[in-house]
Amino acid sequence: DQSLRVLQSLGAVLVNIELPCSFGDFRNAVSAVASAEGYATTCELIDQEHLPLDQHVRRRMLAGRDVSAKDYLHSMREMNAWRSTFRELMKEFDALLTPTGFTTAIPASEVDEMVIPAYYTRATNILELCALALPNGYGPDGLPTSLCIHGHPFAEATVLRIGWALEQATIEEKRQPRGLI
């Protein structure tokens, strides 16, 4: 909320919008496509069990072997429909602002290698947008929070200008959060 107030003070006009779907709706479509394409790209390495490869990466990539052509094509059609809908919705706006993640950063010791915390950022990839994740404060636990600025395809300059303005207007004490490593 503080970041939004700062952007408003800099002249940004903020509008709450209702999205045509939830960010959670993207999960299954992305999972099918990313798994299938990831496996197709790396199968020569993934299938050779004697090669040294992180077990979590291997397990995630192997999931793509079981994605059917039907599921893959259905997910691609779904993603294309979302792209059209969002491009129409975004015509009136320079950017979409969301948190970068559901939570503050977590200590490295608590990272679950099988969980990809990409609830909001996953949409950026599906919708072929550009985005900038910008640290914007600290949660009650003292760990960093982040704002994600999503922009139109190839509108990196706009997204970077918004991020630069926000960063320059928020002088935050620079500190390294405790307990991350």
Predicted region positions:
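Structural helix-boundary/capping segments
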Residues: 1-10, 67, 73-77, 84, ...
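General small-molecule cofactor/ligand-binding pocket signal
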Residues: 13-18
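Short, surface-exposed loop/helix-turn segments at secondary-structure junctions
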Residues: 28-33, 73-74, 103-122
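Short helix-loop capping/hinge segments that flank enzyme active sites or metal/cofactor-binding pockets
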Residues: 32-87, 133-144
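Small-aliphatic-rich amphipathic alpha-helix that forms the alpha element of a beta-alpha
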Residues: 87, 111-135
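Glycine-rich, N-terminal phosphate-binding loop of Rossmann-like dinucleotide-binding domains
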Residues: 100
